[in-house]
Amino acid sequence: MKKIANFANKKVLVLGLAKSGESAARLLDKLGAIVTVNDGKPFEENPAAQSLLEEGIKVVTGGHPLELLDEDFELMVKNPGIPYDNAMVVRALEKKIPVITEVELAYLISEAPIIGITGSNGKTTTTTMIAQVLTAGGQNGLLSGNIGFPASQVAQTASSKDMLVMELSSFQLMGIEDFHPQIAVITNLMPTHLDYHGSVEEYAAAKWNIQKNMTADDYLVLNFNQDWAKEMASQTQATVVPFSTTEKVDGAYLEGDVLTFRGEAIMQVAEIGVPGSHNVENALATIAVAKLRGIDNQTIKEVLSAFGGVKHRLQYVGQVNEVAFYNDSKSTNILATQKALSGFDNSKVILIAGGLDRGNEFDELVPDLKGLKKMVILGQSAARVKRAADQAGVSYLDATDVRDAAHKAFAQAEPGDIVLLSPANASWDMYSNFEVRGDEFLAAFEELKG
């Protein structure tokens, strides 16, 4: 049995709040640590800090004073969104203070085995699929991590009979030391978050960290559609179980239109409850994990057939006058939009795209845009997206925001058409996160529905 860490009387600095920091602070306080929370937001605008102070936890807000680190902390638990070149983090590391993220903390305090899922795209859907299949098969799959349920919060009540099914971002994985999943999944890798990581190599290294402490008794599920996965398969101590839509592998693969695991037919592609080639990959990864956990084929098929998707991830919203609306606000990069478009007939799609300008062009998207009925373009990156539309020969309209875009797209639509929000860009030029952007699209749908 794993030894549970002892935090009693340990001086810990929690850097950054949001959901994970707040959860970590409460957990550490409950475990007897001497906790200080530091957050950049002013106290009067910081409900989380106010709540923690009322509970007797020390808070320092409105900035990150370096002198705070003179208090001889034994550990820093860093919000994953705070980069490692932050002055507080740099100083802590110089002072030899261990810096971890909240998922490492969750691992240290729980006996529950962990299934960790990471990747550039598809990780939320795959995480949700896995948790649902495990639970339906009699194993309690507890969703946690980057999916919106702080891992440390879920880990507090999890027993050794549960399975912590964690969605893990590259930001979280950079801060692991002892974190050890029983099964890990890397859905795919593509260049993203380079403003945080600095280079493709650093980003890939952060993702690869998921297998850092795995052994031959553990399983690493990799996407063999991508060459990097084949190349890296020999660089891990874990037992690799591949999945692929393009070739037969010793794992999960497509046999014609049949999702198959090591020769066992599981289900037809057409039976998956959500559309798109990316969801075939997500389903194959889920099948690999489920079979490794001993779940029967009928249960896997039933869950994946009934799977309705995840909010903001190619979510079917409904119809207005026989025009279907899909909310793929989580599409923050080109690959995600390519995957979304692959599930539809372009001639019926009115695509809403654009968002934060990170300086990248959209040439790779041009082949996928060809044949679209229309585009509605918005955001900082509009000029770059328009260049791609011009190259693809697609006409477009401008929009001021997502609500405006949804209304304009619907005005162009005919019965049988599809209005698809799949921006291929992050949301931060106009919205605080992709959820807020997606919620505005959902609200616009309700307006149009009347």
Swiss-Prot record:
One of the record's GO cellular component terms: cytoplasm
Catalyzed reaction equations: UDP-N-acetyl-alpha-D-muramoyl-L-alanine + D-glutamate + ATP = UDP-N-acetyl-alpha-D-muramoyl-L-alanyl-D-glutamate + ADP + phosphate + H(+)
Positions contributing to ATP binding: 119-125
Pathway participation: Cell wall biogenesis; peptidoglycan biosynthesis
Keyword Ligase: yes
Entry keywords, A to Z: ATP-binding, Cell cycle, Cell division, Cell shape, Cell wall biogenesis/degradation, Cytoplasm, Ligase, Nucleotide-binding, Peptidoglycan synthesis
InterPro entries assigned to the protein according to its UniProt record, in alphabetical order: Mur-like_cat_sf (IPR036565), Mur_ligase_C (IPR004101), Mur_ligase_C_dom_sf (IPR036615), Mur_ligase_cen (IPR013221), MurD (IPR005762)
UniProt-recorded Gene Ontology molecular function terms: ATP binding; UDP-N-acetylmuramoylalanine-D-glutamate ligase activity
Enzyme kind, highest EC tier: ligase
Pfam families reported in the protein's UniProt record: Mur_ligase_C, Mur_ligase_M, MurD-like_N
Cysteines paired by S-S bonds: none
Family: Belongs to the MurCDEF family.
Protein function: Cell wall formation. Catalyzes the addition of glutamate to the nucleotide precursor UDP-N-acetylmuramoyl-L-alanine (UMA).
Protein name per Swiss-Prot or TrEMBL: UDP-N-acetylmuramoylalanine--D-glutamate ligase
Gene this chain is encoded by: murD
